[in-house]
């Protein structure tokens, strides 16, 4: 809020007179003021620091800077800013996000590691200047590190994982997605020193083979979350080892791992009863047989991405409707064998009335308005995707909305092709083509 006083615009932090601020400082003890300041975000703290010398000291006290997220300022953050923050915060800092801060490199992060040895959560996602030298610094100075995000730090190699293994034994969550220089040797070194890992994100680590998963399965019994999206060399052999060694697994993403078969679904059903999230988009070898075993054994499933699992039929939906009462999000896009009958079972199933929130049916050519009728009873349904479902009509969507007025329906209806010109010589285009 700003006011105009004698033609001069002032922020609310500049509206205190010296006497006002003096009264506050006199009435409230320093400890209480510090406690109040501890609830303020970075921007507000910086504004408070400009009110007076006393408030400058309070606002910039290291105890107020235990959690810092600089994502909103990513374009402006350079190495010297991180160095200054680390010197001011010191041992108080527990959580820092530098996500997207392209100007931050190894030298600044070495200073940070030296000064902030109690750091527990650090995000360097997208900090592309970061190399193995940073992980060496973290290993040397930050033994309390629990969560580390290095996604898209493409210079990271096996040396980083070896360093983390040696110096960060408390590590529970590591994201090295798109660090495509990492191989099975790096994973082997990591898990031998960080056996308490609970979440491992390996999306786009295209050099990883089954051998890497065998190391994880053998050394990470606490693993809860594993993301292997587009790890194209992974097969049943490696993932079965994960299932047998990581019984606490709750979330698995294997989307794009096109080599896997029903053997994985059987292994999950037999070994991972706590599974809540399964993403297997574009895994075209999976069938109803595997999903039947999965559904009958994993009753806590909440989210399933089955996009382009082209062999599944209504049989899978029948099993999910019977055995998975907690299902909230289901993607069936490009599952072209799904029909209205499968949606009918889902709409009458255990999850329908209170749980199901999102269903995606893009490019399901056999789906008609009858499916929308079956989904009317899903009172928690928030969103439905119907792109390129050519038998769905506007009238069917309108009827669905009368029962579920707050639902978001994403659909597309091709514009009508304009009539030919009188002379008949003009080429006909649909409206989309004309616009383009």
UniProtKB/Swiss-Prot annotation:
Gene Ontology biological process terms in this record: behavioral fear response; regulation of protein catabolic process at presynapse, modulating synaptic transmission; regulation of synaptic vesicle exocytosis
Tissue: Highly expressed in brain.
Residue ranges constituting the F-box domain according to the UniProt record: 22-68
Pfam families noted in UniProt: F-box-like, LRR_6
Residue spans of the LRR repeats: 74-100, 101-126, 127-152, 153-178, 179-204, 205-230, 231-256, 257-282, 283-308, 309-334, 335-363, 364-388, 389-414
The keyword Transcription regulation belongs to this UniProt entry's keyword annotation: no
Gene3D superfamilies: 1.20.1280.50, Ribonuclease Inhibitor
GO terms for cellular component: cytoplasm; glutamatergic synapse; presynapse; Schaffer collateral - CA1 synapse; synapse
Inactivation phenotype: Altered electrophysiological synaptic activity, with increased frequency of miniature excitatory postsynaptic currents.
UniProt main location, coarse: cytoplasm
PTM sites of type Phosphothreonine: 417
UniProt KW keywords: Cytoplasm, Leucine-rich repeat, Phosphoprotein, Repeat, Ubl conjugation pathway
Positions carrying Phosphoserine: 421
Compartments, record wording: Cytoplasm
Subunit structure: Interacts with SKP1 and CUL1.
Role description: Substrate-recognition component of the SCF (SKP1-CUL1-F-box protein)-type E3 ubiquitin ligase complex. Isoform 3 regulates neural transmission by binding and ubiquitinating RIMS1, a modulator of presynaptic plasticity.
Protein name: F-box/LRR-repeat protein 20
